[in-house]
C-alpha cells in the first residue's frame, strides 16, 4: 500500500511510516479566500497546515529561530492595534520592510501552502490562512497575487493573529483584518507626512513604490484618510485604470519577498532543503513549495 501511495502521490515511502502528525486545531484556522470555503477546502488546507507545522518542527530541531514576540491585541480597534504593534516593533510610520522576514523575526512561522494542486481541485482557491498551534503562530500563503498583493495578504493574516487569535473566520473578522492590513502597510499618519493634499499621479506612484503597495491600494488609502477629494480620487482611478493598474501593476515589483529562515537552510552546508524533504518523506518540489522557493509566473 505504501508503495502504491508513493507512486500515486509522489511522497517518499518513509512519509507513510512516520508517527501521526499532530492535529492543528480546525477552529483556529483563519482562511483568506474569495468566498466562503467549503468543508472539503478546509480539510485540504488543514492537511497542508499539518505538513507545514511538521516542516517547522524539523527547522526548529536543526536551527535556532527568534523568540516569540506577538502581542494579544484582541481588544483593540484595527487602527490602534497597528499603532501599538508598529510601536512595539519599532517601525514608526516608515514603510514596512520585508513582511516575511519581519514576521519571522518576531517568531511567526511563514510557509507556502504546499498542497496547491489539492486546493485547486476544490475550485475554491485559498490565498492564505493563519493559525495558532501549540502556542506558536503560523501563516501559510499560496502566493497567488502580485508581490504587492502578497504583502497585503501577509499583513491581513498578521492582523488575524494579533486581533482574532482564537476566532473562526467571519465577515466582521475579515473586515477588521483588511482594515488592519491597510493601516499597517500605509499608516494614516504617513499619508499626511509624505503626501500633499490631492497628490499628483507622479507623487502617488512614488509613494506606492516606497511603501511597496499597489497603486490602486495607495489611491484608495489616500482617499480613505481624507488626503484627497472625491473628485480627485475618481480622476486618479480613471487614469490608473487607463494605464492598466486595475488588472496588473505596471512597473511593479518583479519578485516575492524572500524568507530568511528558508534561505538560510538553502545555503547551509550541514542541512539542506533536500535533507528536510528526505527526513520528512516529502517530494522535493513540495518541500520547496513549503519553503517559499517560488517564482512569479509568466502570463
Segments the model singles out, each with a brief description of its role:
Residues 1-299:
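Active-site hotspot residues in diverse enzymes, especially metal/ion-binding acidic/histidine motifs
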Amino acid at each position: 500500500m505504501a508503495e502504491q501511495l508513493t507512486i500515486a502521490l509522489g511522497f517518499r515511502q518513509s512519509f507513510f511510516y512516520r508517527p501521526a502528525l499532530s492535529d492543528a486545531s480546525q477552529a483556529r484556522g483563519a482562511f483568506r479566500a474569495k468566498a466562503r470555503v467549503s468543508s472539503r477546502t478546509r480539510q485540504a488546507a488543514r492537511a497542508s497546515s499539518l505538513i507545514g507545522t511538521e516542516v517547522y518542527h524539523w527547522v526548529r530541531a536543526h536551527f535556532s529561530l527568534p523568540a516569540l514576540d506577538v502581542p494579544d491585541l484582541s481588544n483593540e480597534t484595527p487602527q490602534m492595534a497597528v499603532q501599538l504593534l508598529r510601536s512595539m516593533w519599532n517601525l514608526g510610520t516608515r514603510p514596512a520592510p520585508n513582511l516575511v522576514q519581519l514576521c519571522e523575526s518576531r517568531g511567526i512561522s511563514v510557509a507556502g501552502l504546499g498542497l496547491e494542486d489539492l486546493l485547486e481541485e476544490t475550485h475554491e482557491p485559498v490565498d492564505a490562512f493563519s493559525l495558532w498551534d501549540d502556542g506558536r503562530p503560523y501563516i501559510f500563503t499560496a502566493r497567488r497575487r502580485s508581490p504587492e498583493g502578497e504583502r497585503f495578504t501577509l499583513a491581513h493574516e498578521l492582523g488575524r493573529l494579533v486581533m482574532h487569535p482564537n476566532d473562526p473566520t467571519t465577515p466582521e473578522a475579515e473586515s477588521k483584518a483588511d482594515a488592519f492590513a491597510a493601516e499597517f502597510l500605509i499608516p494614516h499618519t504617513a499619508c499626511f507626512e509624505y503626501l500633499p493634499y490631492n497628490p499628483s499621479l507622479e507623487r502617488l506612484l512614488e509613494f506606492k513604490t516606497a511603501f511597496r503597495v499597489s497603486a490602486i491600494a495607495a489611491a484608495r488609502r489616500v482617499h480613505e484618510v481624507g488626503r484627497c477629494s472625491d473628485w480627485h480620487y475618481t480622476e486618479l482611478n480613471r487614469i490608473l485604470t487607463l494605464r492598466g493598474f486595475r488588472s496588473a501593476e505596471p512597473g511593479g515589483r518583479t519578485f516575492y519577498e524572500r524568507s530568511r529562515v528558508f534561505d538560510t537552510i538553502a545555503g547551509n552546508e550541514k542541512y539542506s532543503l533536500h535533507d528536510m524533504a528526505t527526513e520528512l518523506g516529502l517530494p522535493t518540489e513540495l518541500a520547496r513549495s513549503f519553503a517559499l522557493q517560488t517564482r512569479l509566473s509568466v502570463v
